Amino acid sequence: MKDVPAFLQQSQSSGPGQAAVWHRLEELYTKKLWHQLTLQVLDFVQDPCFAQGDGLIKLYENFISEFEHRVNPLSLVEIILHVVRQMTDPNVALTFLEKTREKVKSSDEAVILCKTAIGALKLNIGDLQATKETIEDVEEMLNNLPGVTSVHSRFYDLSSKYYQTIGNHASYYKDALRFLGCVDIKDLPVSEQQERAFTLGLAGLLGEGVFNFGELLMHPVLESLRNTDRQWLIDTLYAFNSGDVDRFQTLKSAWGQQPDLAANEAQLLRKIQLLCLMEMTFTRPANHRQLTFEEIAKSAKITVNKVELLVMKALSVGLVRGSIDEVDKRVHMTWVQPRVLDLQQIKGMKDRLELWCTDVKSMELLVEHQAQDILT
């Protein structure tokens, strides 16, 4: 049994500037007000004044460990995460977290947060296989939770960093966007917003099978790059989203300076040509989706004899549905993969809807005026 009062008294005298905080901790502990004490400790461990040295480790060993069984499991893990940051040996930290996981097994959220922290440590020491296994294990548990919880953001932060480390652009893009969907962008420093926006943009362009840029384009994190030396990335993303091959080629002087993009120029060109075909299909009225080979070739900046190959590729990966008429050199599209739209694309839909409403109104007036003839 540790002498908690003695530890708290000693802490009060050793840090006069924080004496009131230590006194408050002692008061709540003595009165056994566990909920209020938990909240006070949560505030305490987040105070930058106590982030240095091993003060939080001593706090845990001499104080928190005496009543941790009375603390809400998720809150306990939140506290523990601050404690392990002061452990210089990652193996010691891992052992500590494993023991904590056993203590909080009554709460799925607490276990998930604990395992996520373990995965982050594994990633930091370069144990990629263990990190992968942890992510797979936690993701299965996460899918069983109702709604979005406070642990979702930490998991997606871990998984996106893992995918970034192994160079899986598509998975990074997906989970990094999920992370942003779980946090308030205002809580992230501008420098972090800019870095996340930049890596997300690159991952979207380079990611295999990523054809949906609307969610990123509509997210405020991208605005952190506006009017900076990385503005070109926003422009390039908009070019891809609208399938504007001309614009993409015009911007080459900017994106061509980025090594990863320059090294994958041919892949990027193929992707934007597919997006061009999608956009051509999307902007046509549903009853007028006959595209000629010449129209496709002109927009996608390819020769006519390569159009069929482009369309077949789009059909094979499920971006569009339709049929090719080789004799008349036409493509009849019946469906295009749904995407998150940017404001310009939404405006285009609005214009087409208004045109449709006008046509319906005209038909209504026609029937009204000629009703007698029709009835007789």
Curated annotation (Swiss-Prot):
PCI domain span: 171-338
GO molecular function: structural molecule activity
Keywords: Acetylation, Proteasome
Superkingdom of origin: Eukaryota
Residue numbers bearing the N6-acetyllysine modification: K298
Subunit structure: Component of the 19S proteasome regulatory particle complex. The 26S proteasome consists of a 20S core particle (CP) and two 19S regulatory subunits (RP). The regulatory particle is made of a lid composed of 9 subunits including PSMD13, a base containing 6 ATPases and few additional components.
A single cellular component GO annotation: proteasome complex
Pfam families to which the protein is assigned, alphabetical: PCI, PSD13_N
Gene: Psmd13
Family designation: Belongs to the proteasome subunit S11 family.
Keyword 4Fe-4S attributed: no
SUPFAM superfamilies associated with the record: Winged helix' DNA-binding domain
GO biological process: meiosis I; ubiquitin-dependent protein catabolic process
InterPro entries documented for this protein: PCI_dom (IPR000717), PSD13_N (IPR054179), PSMD13 (IPR035298), WH_DNA-bd_sf (IPR036390)
Function noted in UniProt: Component of the 26S proteasome, a multiprotein complex involved in the ATP-dependent degradation of ubiquitinated proteins. This complex plays a key role in the maintenance of protein homeostasis by removing misfolded or damaged proteins, which could impair cellular functions, and by removing proteins whose functions are no longer required. Therefore, the proteasome participates in numerous cellular processes, including cell cycle progression, apoptosis, or DNA damage repair.
Name recorded for this polypeptide: 26S proteasome non-ATPase regulatory subunit 13
